[in-house]
Amino acid sequence: KSLGSINPGANSAITDISCPSGYLVAGGGPKSGYSNFTMMWNAPLNTTTWRAEANNDGTGAINVDMQIVCLAVAGLHSQVITKTLGSINSHTNSSIIDIACPSGYLIAGGGPKSGYSNFTMMWNAPLNTTTWKAEAYNDGSSAINVDVQVVCLAVSGLHSQIITKSLGSVSSGSNSPITDASCPSGYLVAGSGPNSGYSNFTLMWNAPISTSTTRSEAWNDNSSGSIFVQMQIVCLKH
């Protein structure tokens, strides 16, 4: 689903993307040829819907599409867990927060929910098969608040693997290579996200391109030098 054309300094429309009847949402993310945008909302709204909103930090109009994963298995249950990163001062990192699924549930995907723009999700990825890790950096001039919402799934016989793939060294003002990460045979892709010690980057691509593969591309808008970004992907099998 498209967020449409977004003017400089403006927010997109808040866009809800619903799964087909009988399916539960498992993850999602942006697909764009543009850099310099912040995904203010990129998270589950409820068990069947993903919500997206982007802010254009750049000097020209941009377009951002959203792609989400929906899964269906007889007896599949879902819970959406919300945890706040708290108040984040200007040019400061939030605390690193771990969000654990309830007992018996596996992590599927997650992302930020905020009324603020100009922040980087340095960590927004699975830590292990039951926990999501989040850390945000505030690129703006005043304090902000960011919540993170994750999807947890449960059904008898559900298995998970976490796949890690590096985007390599990304030079200042440059894009990383477009990088595809595929799940092992028999597994389906769910959510994904970055694991980085660096701030000030945009994930132009962080979305599924098929039922088993996620595509990632980062743009480094940090003027002080190269950065490294790793992507971590949840793969599920029943």
Annotate each language-model stretch with its function.
Residues K1-H238:
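Extracellular attachment/recognition segments
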